[in-house]
Amino acid sequence: MVWAPVAVAVMHFGFGWRILDRERVRRRYREVRAGSDAPLIVCANHLTMLDSAVIASALGSPGWYLRHYSSLPWNMPEWRNFGSSRTRRVLVYLMKCVPVIRGGDRRAVARVLARIRHLASRGEVVLIFPEGGRSRSGRVDVGNAAHGVGRLVGSLPGCQVLCVYARGEGQTETTDVPARGERFRLRLSLIEPTSDARGVRRSLDLSRQIVGELGRLEREVLREAA
């Protein structure tokens, strides 16, 4: 956990990033974690390569994560960016990352999802971007729901989904890194998606419910910022 305060210090002092109403966000996350033992998947919109770090720092402090390590979300970075060497693989594991190759071999992706499912079933929190990649338009693409997240949620009985919408005040489009001095607005919504469909249709239905909720949160944030 040594990396956590270092990462927060870099974001806060190095880049000058701020989370607006941070204590409200953290209080809500603590309530969610204390309110149920059900599996929890955090699903978020995706605008930059550092969204996972921004969201993790918004949901809890390094000290709180040290006492509640299972609440620090696992995430799935692109293998080509982070998993290309043994040293990097060790580092990303310590940082609670399970690298995945986007658009790679289905069996390899299935193994990653199985690992993520195992972690979630044991009480670990997992962070996923249900649109499957960074938004090209800078907005949530409600029609671009990846069925993988729906399959994961559907395979975990009673699974809850914490939808997290995060956006920098100056963010108008997709970028690699948020701007220096950026201030982030976050909205959280806890849902439990259900579907009577079966197979792939069920997975897609669950995914669309999640992305649809992110779209609703986006509209709230944009109205507030206007």
What label would you give each PLM region?
Residues 10-20, 102-107, 138-140:
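Short, flexible loop segments at the rims of nucleotide/cofactor-binding pockets, characterized by
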Residues 34-104:
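Catalytic core of membrane glycerolipid acyltransferases/transacylases, capturing the structured
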Residues 22-31, 56-63, 194:
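Short regulatory "switch" loops immediately downstream of catalytic or recognition motifs
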Residues 19, 75, 97-99, 161, ...:
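Conserved beta-strand scaffold positions in the cores of enzyme catalytic domains, especially
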Residues 38, 106-226:
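Non-catalytic C-terminal accessory region of glycerolipid acyltransferases
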Residues 1-18, 84-96, 110, 178-181:
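Alpha-helical membrane-targeting segments
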Residues 9-39, 190:
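A short, well-structured juxtamembrane/interface segment
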